[in-house]
Amino acid sequence: MGWLDEAARIEMVDHSSIKKHEPPSSNNINWLDATGEKTSTNELTADFEKHFDGGPASIRVKLHRPMATFSLTVLFGPSGAGKSTTLRCLAGLDRPDRGIIRFGDEIWFDAERNIFLPPQQRNIGYLFQDYALFPHLTVRQNVAYGLRKFSAPLRRQRIEEITSLLEIGGLEHRFPRQLSGGQQQRVALARTLVCRPRLLLLDEPLSALDAPTRHQLRRQLRHWLVQLQISTLLVTHDRSEALAFGDHLALFHAGRVCQNGPVQEVFAAPADVNAARIVGVDTIAQGRIVNISDGLATVEVGQTQLVALAPPAGAAIGSEVYICIHAEGVTLEVGAALPETSARNRLVGRIRAVDREGPIVRLNLDCGFPLKALITNQAYENMGLHEWSDVVALIKATAIHVIMSGPSSREGKIINRSRYGQI
């Protein structure tokens, strides 16, 4: 089945019970579900397993998200970790092998009871990576595709509302080939939203755009979804996108959800070393706790001792741990007379490597263990730094996250199952 067929299956919502009433005279979007009734409180529960032919790869997904009010859940992780297949199973485009998927009081899939609700009966919106616009239809015809069973006045109202909100009103008679990437993205989103889905699934919606357009639409997309109050699941492997979009984050590794929670919390406090690597922690080093006092742990790392917040449970003197430090949590100073700061850790080090990235500079330091720091290009020049410069790295105890060593942390190697396809 091609992407046009899949897009058609998603857009063909079952409108058999829709009331063909005339639209009220209002300029505001009256955000109702596809039946014309107010959207009820919903919870998404997904506990399923999906296997793949040609190898041992599988995904095992456990998600439970309340959807009573607007929330944006990010499915985050490397390519091949299971994110896109999870969306496809939720949408009904792929059928799991075991488990259950429930949304509110509707059962979308139950392997034991042989229940499988087809995509067009789930009232979800799905935005594909390549937008899946119909090339032979105009913008207006693409947007109206899922509204064919509505009355003409209601179709007209819905189209006018969504094209106005997404600022594509002047493009209605153009064909997709005549649009920029950003315009195509807006049209695809309009076609998805005009049917009033109860749940929106976005599969890396900005990945095909150039950087400036992606940055602009990132802010706008979040604003539109908040306005429309549509609970959303978004797939991405872009860290900045996850931080900008999400309220809640489900972290995927090797076909499993290895951690979930508020976005900032997961990025700041990964549960194990695999999670730390996936969220992009810059410095991960092995150490050993040598002292615990007043909620602080002293950790011996290489030839250095660091003071960090003690792990919440299970920590004792002699425990093997990993310390995690984001590069932006490291402040650099030069010179003998250093000002007093609140940073508990003052490490003498030397710059071993310099990596310039436009306005920022990434530095690899040797502070008795490898440490990465991030400063602006202007600060780098003002401080007169260069490779082999001696510096002092200042790190607050709160900027060091300690992970207890265990089987998942010692594993260290991130499994890439991409040879079995995008899962």
What residue spans do the PLM features occupy?
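Conserved ABC transporter NBD signature motif
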Residues: H15, N30, A34, G99-A111
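Glycine/charge-rich catalytic "coupling/switch" loops of P-loop NTPases
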Residues: I29, A268, Q305-D355, K372-I423
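A short, flexible loop at the N-terminus of ABC-type nucleotide-binding domains that lies
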Residues: K38, E43-T69, E112-F116, S151, ...
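ABC nucleotide-binding domain signature
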Residues: T73-V74, F116-P118, R122-A132, L233
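The feature captures the beta-strand-to-loop junction immediately N-terminal to the Walker
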Residues: F76-P78
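ABC ATPase nucleotide-binding domain helices that frame the ATP-binding cleft
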Residues: S84-L87, V187
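Helix-to-loop junction immediately C-terminal to a conserved catalytic motif
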Residues: A91
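ABC ATPase nucleotide-binding domains
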Residues: N123-G125, H136-N274
